[in-house]
Amino acid sequence: MIKRKKLYFMKITIIGSGAWGSTLAQVLTDNNNQVLLYDTNLSYVEKINQGKHPIFNTPLLNVKAVSCLKQTLEYSDLIVLAVPMKFMRHLLKKITLMLTNPKSFVNVSKGIEPLTFLRVSEIVKQVIPAPLLANFASLMGPSHAEEVILRKLTLLTAASSNPVFSLEIQKLFSCPNYLKVYTSSDLVGNEICSAFKNILALINGILVAKDFGINSQAALMSRGILEMSRLVTFYQGNPQTVLGLPGLGDLIVTAFSKYSRNFNAGAKIAAGIPYQQIIDSSLQTVEGFQTLNAFYQLQLKHNLDLPIIQASYQLIFESKPFDTVFATLIQRPYKSEF
């Protein structure tokens, strides 16, 4: 038997008290852990300290929130990152200036950084000095906060290059009654799949709004999974991860659910609303737009075969007519499926 070093945390800091961050606070307190949430949104902080979830009309008990980042960093040695991708690097730079001892990080945000094409794990390693970075893991999978807050059965995957740490995160977040966590060593694949599925959800929202049938949606999912696999391979991840919870599982949830911000944003695109207007009017971040831009630029730079990404970019960012983009995509040369 392998003797493992104890990494279990009884105090956890969550940075970002939005829908998912606050919901994960409930998961952790259900497991008898102590949680401190951080947010710059003072109304969120006030609601949480009143025992209310800041987004949903549900109680959030035994959780405290503050607006002082230094206080939250001093609270525990485990930091859960639950902020949108566009704020990630800036946040990590602020954290680095305040760290005095090594911390472990768990990322629950999904996306790729534009321009750099970096995953969250890569940004963390780039920004946080090695002596101050104890461990890193991602926690991903099909998990609408709207259902988890009601304690409906959900499965997630904790991925880390450190198998001991992924096991500890599995134990920390698993609730016997409603949340089960698997482990994975494919951190790369989990991050890519979790980001890519938001793009397919955007496009599926467009298809549904334009009254395309389930046959068309199934075709989008199938060919989209193939492109997801190509990207995972490009990033040197395990293509098998595409069939796991952060891949196929999260894709189903995001592309077909009424709760999905990306799916609903796609429907608005179909109605002729510009993507920037959708972003500006959304109370919660629609990660699919930024991720689409990042993967499109990556495709151009490395000459990758990602026709759905290319068509989606033309439709959303270049405002090309849907019929024109669709015709170009469907009239691609005939060839073998794989």
UniProtKB/Swiss-Prot annotation:
Family, per entry: Belongs to the NAD-dependent glycerol-3-phosphate dehydrogenase family.
Pathway listed: Membrane lipid metabolism; glycerophospholipid metabolism
Main function: Catalyzes the reduction of the glycolytic intermediate dihydroxyacetone phosphate (DHAP) to sn-glycerol 3-phosphate (G3P), the key precursor for phospholipid synthesis.
GO molecular-function terms, A-Z: glycerol-3-phosphate dehydrogenase [NAD(P)+] activity; NAD binding
Pfam families: NAD_Gly3P_dh_C, NAD_Gly3P_dh_N
Stated name of the protein: Glycerol-3-phosphate dehydrogenase [NAD(P)+]
Stored PROSITE patterns: NAD_G3PDH
Top EC category: oxidoreductase
Entry annotated with the keyword Cell membrane: no
Residue positions of the active site: K197 (proton acceptor)
Record-linked NCBIfam families: PRK00094.1-2, PRK00094.1-4
Gene label: gpsA
InterPro entries, per database record: 6-PGluconate_DH-like_C_sf, 6PGD_dom2, G3P_DH_NAD-dep, G3P_DH_NAD-dep_C, G3P_DH_NAD-dep_N, NAD(P)-bd_dom_sf
Native source organism of the sequence: Aster yellows witches'-broom phytoplasma (strain AYWB)
Cysteine-cysteine disulfides: none
Residues the entry annotates as binding sn-glycerol 3-phosphate: K110, G141, S143, K197, D250, S260, R261, N262
